């Protein structure tokens, strides 16, 4: 039985804001790819219905933590629909590698890993599609992590189409600041009218992120980081930031640049993968 479950990072290889709904949600087109790097969750089934997070995050109550919320959401769904009467409790701990507020999808990935893992461990029998639909209540990015394949997303991020971008190597760097998503989406200067284009057109265009100009304007550290990385390779913001990634054809090239990074830059090198490590471990392609 698997105890340790990967919770991978994601990159937005491009991100375009195409409009805004009356309820305030932004419409977008984005290309998600996973990284072979992320957090690790250790999950053990309890013989009661208690959900215990053994590694709480300072300043974040359990009822707001996406790990706990995901476990309780699945628990309530299974109870409501009478799915398996086996004990459905869990003890969960996390080895955290991904920065908060970095644009790497850490919280959404954690929630998705909990849904996928506990669905297996509790023998709930839900399909990935059902789990993805359930996970949407936790965040717009959760479904792509649940489904586990690189994807082109539209709408508010919930309409997913499988995609297979090149699996390049990336230097992912954090400027030392966290950027709350509302800071970017609430900025009056954010471009919200990028034309909607079909995927085949977007894949042939130069990739960009409509959130990047706002992040660079409002956070001097992001501006400095992007400017430094652009000296070495094509680089851009992921999500709403604050992490920036530079793309390379080889791991060696990426590590050479990381080794030259100033002390204020914290980063790692990882490979882009189109099948999530979470799903590869479930299918036995990689060892737990």
Swiss-Prot record:
Which UniProt keyword terms apply here?
A: ATP-binding, Isoprene biosynthesis, Kinase, Nucleotide-binding, Transferase
Q: Name one GO molecular function term.
A: ATP binding
Protein's pathway: Isoprenoid biosynthesis; isopentenyl diphosphate biosynthesis via DXP pathway; isopentenyl diphosphate from 1-deoxy-D-xylulose 5-phosphate: step 3/6
Catalysed reaction per UniProt?
Answer: 4-CDP-2-C-methyl-D-erythritol + ATP = 4-CDP-2-C-methyl-D-erythritol 2-phosphate + ADP + H(+)
Annotated binding of ATP, by residue: 99-109
What Pfam families is this protein classified in?
GHMP_kinases_C, GHMP_kinases_N
Enzyme Commission code(s) on record = 2.7.1.148
Q: Where is the active site?
A: 10, 141
Picking any one GO biological process from the record gives: isopentenyl diphosphate biosynthetic process, methylerythritol 4-phosphate pathway
InterPro entries in UniProt: GHMP_kinase_C_dom, GHMP_kinase_C_sf, GHMP_kinase_N_dom, IspE, Ribosomal_Su5_D2-typ_SF, Ribsml_uS5_D2-typ_fold_subgr
The region annotated as signal peptide is none
Instruction: Tell me the function of this protein.
Output: Catalyzes the phosphorylation of the position 2 hydroxy group of 4-diphosphocytidyl-2C-methyl-D-erythritol.
Q: How does it assemble?
A: Homodimer.
Q: Which family does it belong to?
A: Belongs to the GHMP kinase family. IspE subfamily.
Against PANTHER family, the record matches this protein to: 4-DIPHOSPHOCYTIDYL-2-C-METHYL-D-ERYTHRITOL KINASE, CHLOROPLASTIC
> What protein is this chain from?
4-diphosphocytidyl-2-C-methyl-D-erythritol kinase
Species of provenance: Serratia proteamaculans (strain 568)
